[in-house]
């Protein structure tokens, strides 16, 4: 079975898993719009959900002429750049060599292949050739030569779709990337909640649910790490979604550095989502021939509440993310002395703990903080190996 199809007549990209459908369409003026993500829809193409009407004070692209019904400010799009009349949050912001900060991304080409795309030096899901299919869509700024390769891999039996973006400069002048999200998605006319997991030292992974209103909402980190303060995983769901019932969408960024997850509910009730590297103090210059790859977002959809979504991620990470010989066998068990002794230990105490660990079948004993010189508290001897 083909899990990714392109319907030439309708110009629709149709991505399927066993329990979800994801569709995009190339519309007027080579604009790539987002159509649908959710329950399977059989052979249907969801092309009638986009309603083009005149929205006051929402501008229209130059190519549209006097047609006031086609506005990038209200269309559900797949991946947008700043400076084209769409004033919502966006996926890409750049600075051109002449100081311009716009990029006008137009559909250029696509390719469907077997297997999973790869990202250089970044963690990502992996697959055997028969476990996944990949779609690569190329959007191009025809003035600067900057291209955005939108990468999608479908894991049909896991109900997972992964996304990433590869930026490539083909023009003669350099382009500085100021913001490069790994994914962007629009939901039409939907009242949604966001579920995220905040925390602090000793109080990690606290769930919080927020109603999304007509405003911007975000979670993220600029600590250099994803941190226990905000996990790079967010769920969007319907207002009535519970553990065993309701629609929910998971977004997990496979990256442990600065990150952001942002939403915006716009003037007509559409919800836009972006996720990726936090743009705070971010800048990456691309000379001709250079590329930049974003981290991967692992997406999934469940029509059966949070429990089903959780199990989808468990299976995906266990089978296609963790690279370890222990994926399918019991892992070694270790004991750490820290909570048992803190700084107050000697050789006899440590030997006793290790001996008891061996007696009950544990595999390793780990000596924690305090083995330095006169390391009796947090204020002395850290790093003193004498």
What positions do the PLM features span?
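Short Pro-Gly-centered flexible turn/kink motifs
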Residues: 95, 100-109, 284-303
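Short acidic, Pro/Gly- and aromatic-enriched capping/linker segments at domain boundaries
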Residues: 1-13, 270-287
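Conserved mixed alpha/beta catalytic, RNA-binding, or beta-rich assembly cores of soluble enzyme
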Residues: 263-265, 277, 304
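Terminal connector regions
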Residues: 31, 155, 299-332
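Polysaccharide-binding surfaces and accessory modules of carbohydrate-active proteins
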Residues: 4-6, 10-14, 18, 22, ...
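Conserved, mostly hydrophobic/aromatic
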Residues: 19, 165, 289, 335, ...
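Aromatic-lined carbohydrate-binding/catalytic grooves of carbohydrate-active enzymes
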Residues: 326-386
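Short loop/turn motifs at secondary-structure junctions
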Residues: 161, 176, 293, 360-361, ...
């Amino acid at each position: 079975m083909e899990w990714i199809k392109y319907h030439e007549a309708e110009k629709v990209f149709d991505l399927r898993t066993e329990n979800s459908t994801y569709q995009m369409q190339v519309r007027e003026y080579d604009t790539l719009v987002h159509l649908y993500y959710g329950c399977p829809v059989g052979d249907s193409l969801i092309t009638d959900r986009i309603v083009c009407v005149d929205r006051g004070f929402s501008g229209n692209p130059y190519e549209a002429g006097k047609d006031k019904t086609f506005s990038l400010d209200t269309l559900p799009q797949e991946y947008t750049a700043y400076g084209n009349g769409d004033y919502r949050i966006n996926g890409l912001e750049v600075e051109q060599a002449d100081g311009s900060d716009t990029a006008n991304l137009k559909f250029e080409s696509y390719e469907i292949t077997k297997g999973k795309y790869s990202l250089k030096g970044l963690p990502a899901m992996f697959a055997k050739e028969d476990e996944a299919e990949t779609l690569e869509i190329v959007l191009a700024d025809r003035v600067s030569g900057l291209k955005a390769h939108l990468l999608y891999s479908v894991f049909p039996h896991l109900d997972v779709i992964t996304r990433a973006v590869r930026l490539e400069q083909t023009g003669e002048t350099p382009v500085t990337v100021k913001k490069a999200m790994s994914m962007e998605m629009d939901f039409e006319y939907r009242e949604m909640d966001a579920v995220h997991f905040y925390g602090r030292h000793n109080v990690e992974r606290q769930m919080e649910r927020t109603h999304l209103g007509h405003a911007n909402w975000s979670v993220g980190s600029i600590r250099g790490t994803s941190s226990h303060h905000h996990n790079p995983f967010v769920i969007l769901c319907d207002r009535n979604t519970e553990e065993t019932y309701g629609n929910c969408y998971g977004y997990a960024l496979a990256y442990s550095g600065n990150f952001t997850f942002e939403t915006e509910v716009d003037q007509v009730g559409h919800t836009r989502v972006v996720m990726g590297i936090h743009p705070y103090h971010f800048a990456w210059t691309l000379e001709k021939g250079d590329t930049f790859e974003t981290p991967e977002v692992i997406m999934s959809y469940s029509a059966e509440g949070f429990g089903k979504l959780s199990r989808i991620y468990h299976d995906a990470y266990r089978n296609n993310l963790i690279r370890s010989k222990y994926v399918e066998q019991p892992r070694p068990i270790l004991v750490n002395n820290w909570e048992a002794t803190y700084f107050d230990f000697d050789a006899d105490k440590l030997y006793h703990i290790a001996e008891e660990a061996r007696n009950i079948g544990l595999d390793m004993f780990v000596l924690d903080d305090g083995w330095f010189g006169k390391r009796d508290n947090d204020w002395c001897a850290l790093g003193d190996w004498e």
